[in-house]
């Protein structure tokens, strides 16, 4: 598999001149590096600056803790986060919308469907912010100096900041609305800062942590939406969870320094894997130039597969850096990628493991309010994946990707309903493996279409698979390989269950 991807993208391939201009000088064994992905290039080229920012933030935090002693963390987060917020994002209007939003939201409580009003206001704010930023972008004199350094480490564009802020603003205000609707003050915990008597809530319980109503204030609001370690790219943490960990009960996991060090080693290993892939197979450059003419179906499939793996890694690495930063800072956010993308056979489970914190946010604030998995499950899923597509970018291609994912979920839901009464039959596992093979192919095609090869590349792959002898041979061989691989994945999950681990994906 590695060799096929290398043969399709290295110097020996006849299509090499078409994408050679996208390659840069590398550092591994004298080879060039495929640094053509814009998002990851910004992260990779400015990695030392990001590390400097982590060191600066951590040093300031430790210094303030020594000087101020027992104080609320959110005060420091408010000051540091607000500076990063004002100086790093190219969306000049976003800070004003954040402040305006806080002033307007209290009045929404007088509206009968205040949750709908909140969502409508935040979505409209995000869209208006995008419009103003694109048409009236400016750069004030006072922050030009800061931007010359800080903006370099901010690899997301204005849209991503607006939609990310949309998610944070919704979390704060929907948590606030839920709190106002909840029972009397007697339901509150007797929370005291740094109280050792408090029991440690798990990650699900912290979503609805009984935070006092007085904690829903402007300082906490701004501290939350501009919390530096998670500001640039996440993972996403809810307002209740953030305040609970910041001001009431630090998780024991952030005090386990051995665990944090092992997490750092895993992060470093992921970077080395990514560097190896970028130096030895130039699949991103090939996909950008559509330089796959004459490649075999096997090579086309491997171009697509390793493209997806690089997309997975380019998201995993920043998320793990920012989560590592947050762990060092004393906040334990969710892990966004809890499985390798190649270790998935279920469409539903795949999305639980991919961008897990965002998946939880979607379920809590969108999917469940829409009705969840009831009789309108398919329609609710369509709404959710449409939102996810727009969250990535406003493109018809991504909307179609979201709708394809929903269509591909339907067979799995149907098969699960039909065969759920036969789980103890000896043939059940093999039927599941056949379904897994179909799922894997459908997930690959949907993601190749949306993020890698586009319409032309995906159609070219499908055409060669079904209209050529070599394509049909590869198709049937790959089906057999995926069938065996699915059995291995089943057994890996059974081994996890025997150890008491069940991550539901």
From Swiss-Prot:
Member of which family? Belongs to the membrane-bound acyltransferase family.
Q: Name one GO biological process term.
A: GPI anchor biosynthetic process
Q: Please report a single Pfam family linked to this protein.
A: MBOAT
* Alphabetical list of InterPro entries matching this protein: MB_O-acyltransferase, MBOAT_fam
Where in the sequence is the active site? Answer: 392
Asked if the Swiss-Prot or TrEMBL record annotates the protein with the keyword Transmembrane helix, the reply is yes
Q: Which residues lie on this side of the membrane: Cytoplasmic?
A: 239-266, 318-377, 420-430, 486-505
Q: Does the keyword Zinc apply?
A: no
**Disulfide bridge map:** none
Transmembrane annotation, as ranges: 218-238, 267-287, 297-317, 378-398, 399-419, 431-451, 465-485
Q: Which GO terms describe its cellular component?
A: endoplasmic reticulum membrane; mitochondrial membrane; plasma membrane
According to its UniProt record, where is this protein located? Answer: Cell membrane; Endoplasmic reticulum membrane; Mitochondrion membrane
Task: Name where it mostly resides.
Answer: membrane
Identify this protein by name. Membrane-bound O-acyltransferase GUP1
Known function: Membrane-bound O-acyltransferase involved in the remodeling of glycosylphosphatidylinositol (GPI) anchors. Acts only on GPI-anchored proteins, but not on free GPI lipids. Also involved in lipid metabolism, having profound effects on sphingolipid-sterol-ordered domains integrity and assembly. Involved in cell integrity and apoptosis.
Instruction: Supply the PANTHER family for this chain.
Output: ACYLTRANSFERASE, PROTEIN-CYSTEINE N-PALMITOYLTRANSFERASE RASP
